[in-house]
Amino acid sequence: MIGIIFNTYALYKIFCYEQFGFKKNQFIIFLVFNLLSSVIVFAYIFSCGLLYCLPYILCAFWLSGVAYADYVSCNVYEIMEYYAVIPILLSILNIINNGTSYALPKLGAALVTVAAYGIMAKAGVFGEGDSDILSAVCIVYFDAYYNCIFFGLVMVLFVIRNFGYAVKNRVMHGNVRPLVPSIYMGYILMLPFVLGSTPES
């Protein structure tokens, strides 16, 4: 409930904050475009019987909007970071309601892992956006082998991100924000769902 109240207040600040002007409108248009695209994807998934992966594809669309906001305004990006938790909650609810192949102990372990990702993100091991993507995917692919791969990918992307900031500071003189590939890794992790794989029973 506290999280819902905080996110509602954050949404109010985003849409009522006039400082961003035209750039803020660009971000809103881009986000609406992503949401409309997700409706099309929803129709396709429903016809193919792959409804369970909808929240994760929505997560990819949502974080792509966050990535765009990163280039529009740091302030918007910092606020929108907290919104990535919404697809994760949808994913958990989807599993509880429809994921008959998930045992409760497995779901509990997945939730613990999600919390661990969040704590590590706050500790600065990797970005909060990375934590959100990994948490959502981990709920489906909760396996030690996949987790090791995820941690390895995140650590590599963490190095790339810091290298990007170094390039920005030395070459771009702070005028252009570097590409943060860790957010876009969500699309790579969504491929198994798009290709029609199913969670293990």
Predicted regions and their residues:
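A membrane-topology feature that recognizes alpha-helical transmembrane segments
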Residues: 1-201
